[in-house]
Amino acid sequence: MDWILSLLLATVRLAIPVLLISLAELYGQRAGMVNIGLEGLASIGALVGFLVCYVTGSNWLGLLCGALAGILVNMIYAFSTVTLCADHTVYGMAVNIFAPALASFIYRVYFGTGSDLKQITTMASIAIPGLKDIPVIGPLLFDQSPMVYLTFVLVIVTAVFFGKTRAGLSYKSVGEHPQAAATLGINVIGVKYLACVICGALAGIGGAYLTTCYSSTCTDGIVAGRGFIALAAVIFGRWNAGGILLACLFFGFCDALQIRLQVSGIAIPYQFFQMIPYVATVVVLSLIGTRQAGPKANGKPYRREQR
């Protein structure tokens, strides 16, 4: 029972960064912005969040600066794709190449190339009195980091925004038919830039969560493909906040399972266990990816004269 509870606790904690990055992509794609540069945005967010927390001792300030770093880097993608109408895939990949390398360079410039691993104090959990004593559910949902609670609240806010509000419908219209949205007076360019700001912020926070709330260290490759898994989660969740939550919990479970199997003493090379989340991603995309269709204007450049 303790093993199962430990696995479920790890599932929730490991699902959070993927969930934050997935919500970043959801806000982007709902405005027609297919950003495959999530891995890079999360990497720079992880590094900046760690550095700021290391210097100031504030996890919250680290998360905030991680968000700002994600926004700043994503503006390269935004200017290229929205203003210059460049290809989304090319510039997304450029961010994936540039940002992790920049993060690694900054870390080495600041800390040097020594072998000692720098550490910070991760954000403490907050237990909700009464609720935390509920068997199984209590420790899972009511004795967690504040970022876990805030992320679940963000899922609810996102679901309500896109499903129940006029502003959300206007936002989604930019991703479905930007020319029609423009005729209704919607500032399509403004919405797309707003989407890039939100996407950069959430992806940066997702990366900063890994260093300030989960790991306490910052190493090369700490994001470990979660940006690409987040892309799969958006498709798996059918561009719906609730569906994305379930998808991220599934991927979080796969990640938690491979960690537990590595220390279980099974006589199998640990690399096989490390493959589990990525194999699960490929299998999921193979089974359902071809049957899903996102917003109709996803990845398509918008030009005002095309009205």
Language model segments and positions:
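Transmembrane alpha-helical segments in multi-pass inner-membrane proteins
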Residues: 203, 214-278
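Helix-loop-helix "hairpin" substructures at the membrane interface of multi-pass membrane proteins
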Residues: 140-218, 241, 246
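Short loop segments and helix-boundary regions at transmembrane helix junctions
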Residues: 30-34, 73-130, 164, 224-225, ...
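Single transmembrane alpha-helix segments in multi-pass membrane proteins
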Residues: 6-55, 63, 68, 72-89, ...
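Hydrophobic alpha-helical transmembrane segments
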Residues: 8-11, 40, 60-68, 90, ...
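Cytosolic-side transmembrane-helix boundaries in multi-pass membrane proteins
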Residues: 176-190, 261-307
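Transmembrane helix-bundle core of multi-pass membrane transporters
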Residues: 100-164, 265-273, 299-307
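Hydrophobic core segments of alpha-helical transmembrane domains in multi-pass membrane transport
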Residues: 21-22, 46-50, 100-101, 148-160, ...
